[in-house]
Amino acid sequence: MADEKNKRWQELADVKRELAQRDWFYGTSGNLSIKVSDDPITFLVTASGKDKRKETDEDFVLVNAAGNPVDPDVPLRPSAETQLHTYVYERTNAGCCLHVHTIDNNVISELYGDKGEIRFKGNEIIKALGYWEEDAEVSLPIIENPAHIPHLAAQFAKHLTEESESGAVLIRNHGITVWGKTASEAKRVLEAYEFLFSYYLKLTLYQKQLVT
């Protein structure tokens, strides 16, 4: 268990470092997790309130399927949104879950929030999401952002399926949560969506400028 925990810790730390280099952790926002064991379910999750651009021995907390620290004496609190991660590991085959707040994903979530989804089509990066068909289209659900975390988690859980190994949900004026079978897969999904957000916003802006 200790060896597996250390291995997963390093994997998650590597992802956190890459995302921090992209400046995706504004104001200590965001949360990351990686599964350590299946039976019982345990996973490492970012500690609450930490500056994720820094690397310390207290970056992550090992929690159980209820989102509570495995070691009750640990002086750290898991992320306030740990419940979303527990649902991912209970209801899907994922091994890693990432959540970031970026300007682009917040703008997209507000522009399309009333529609409850945004669709992307015709961009090569969609293949990174596992869609290889020509002219493949991907739909990303957008949910509201209630202040009460259990309500948010309940909305989020509606988009999780047992057969799912990867996926994403955009939370309105909040951020995106993605999951994947491995840390590298979850990071790939996150990068692909953030690329699509940035591309779509720039394309829309430039198209309007060309028209005028």
UniProtKB/Swiss-Prot annotation:
It is an enzyme of class 4 (lyase). Zn(2+) binds at residues 99, 101. The keyword ATP-binding does not apply. Its EC number is 4.2.1.109. It catalyses: 5-(methylsulfanyl)-D-ribulose 1-phosphate = 5-methylsulfanyl-2,3-dioxopentyl phosphate + H2O. GO terms for cellular component: cytoplasm. SUPFAM superfamilies: AraD/HMP-PK domain-like. Disulfide bonds: none annotated. It comes from the Bacteria. Gene3D superfamilies: Class II aldolase/adducin N-terminal domain (3.40.225.10). Keywords: Amino-acid biosynthesis, Lyase, Metal-binding, Methionine biosynthesis, Zinc. Binds 1 zinc ion per subunit. InterPro entries: Aldolase_II/adducin_N (IPR001303), Aldolase_II/adducin_N_sf (IPR036409), MethylthioRu-1-P_deHdtase_MtnB (IPR017714). Signal peptide: none annotated. GO terms for biological process: L-methionine salvage from methylthioadenosine. Its cofactor is Zn(2+). Pathway: Amino-acid biosynthesis; L-methionine biosynthesis via salvage pathway; L-methionine from S-methyl-5-thio-alpha-D-ribose 1-phosphate: step 2/6. One of its GO terms (molecular function) is methylthioribulose 1-phosphate dehydratase activity. Belongs to the aldolase class II family. MtnB subfamily. Catalyzes the dehydration of methylthioribulose-1-phosphate (MTRu-1-P) into 2,3-diketo-5-methylthiopentyl-1-phosphate (DK-MTP-1-P). Homotetramer. PANTHER family: METHYLTHIORIBULOSE-1-PHOSPHATE DEHYDRATASE. This is Methylthioribulose-1-phosphate dehydratase. It comes from Bacillus pumilus (strain SAFR-032).
